[in-house]
Amino acid sequence: MPEQSNDYRVVVFGAGGVGKSSLVLRFVKGTFRDTYIPTIEDTYRQVISCDKSVCTLQITDTTGSHQFPAMQRLSISKGHAFILVFSVTSKQSLDELSPIYKLIVQIKGSVEDIPIMLVGNKCDETQREVHTREAQAVAQEWKCAFMETSAKMNYNVKELFQELLTLETRRSVSLSVDGKRSSKQKRADRIKGKCALM
């Protein structure tokens, strides 16, 4: 199938086992699996509103290993927005995002207009190695947004993708294609002037 030029491409990066696939599957299909199945690369699609017409939100769930640097570079070069996922139970998983962030900057040049979300997943777990303040400091250093999520508990999953689209300033994108929005979403839409989520 030829790639559509009006696809809005979101790329999800992070170490193996941090819950990248779980976040994507929870968002796209509303499901959660307890077993860990390593991903090489999967792509999921969902219809969204983009510049007042219908287009496809294409979410690329990347491998957690560093065995495929060419695939990483290709995903970054084609990506419009990025989700950098770590597990709050693993400081190493946060540290492993630094070279990926630097690669995004290297390939994209300025990331000033590129939506990037730093995501602390598994916030339902009690054995934390990364505290909220520490992750917020990294996000501030990288000049990106930060959010904690739990794919297992379905906490902040929809909000993560809404916020990512809200950060988009180059064009108007929305997960809503039928025009129905809550009053809270309408207010946020007026404030940002860009996105709303259904």
UniProtKB/Swiss-Prot annotation:
Any matching Pfam family: Ras
What are the BP-aspect GO terms? signal transduction
Q: Can you say where in the cell this protein is located?
A: Cell membrane
InterPro entries given in the database record:
P-loop_NTPase (IPR027417), Small_GTP-bd (IPR005225), Small_GTPase (IPR001806), Small_GTPase_Ras-type (IPR020849)
Covalent lipidation (S-geranylgeranyl cysteine), chain numbering: C195
> What keyword terms does UniProt attach to this protein?
Cell membrane, GTP-binding, Lipoprotein, Membrane, Methylation, Nucleotide-binding, Prenylation
- Mark which residues the record calls propeptide: 196-198
Question: Which GO terms label this protein's molecular function in UniProt?
Answer: GTP binding; GTPase activity
Predominant subcellular localization, coarse grouping: membrane
Where can the motif Effector region be found?
A: 36-44
Family that this chain belongs to:
Belongs to the small GTPase superfamily. Di-Ras family.
State its role.
Displays low GTPase activity and exists predominantly in the GTP-bound form.
Q: Which protein is depicted?
A: GTP-binding protein Di-Ras1
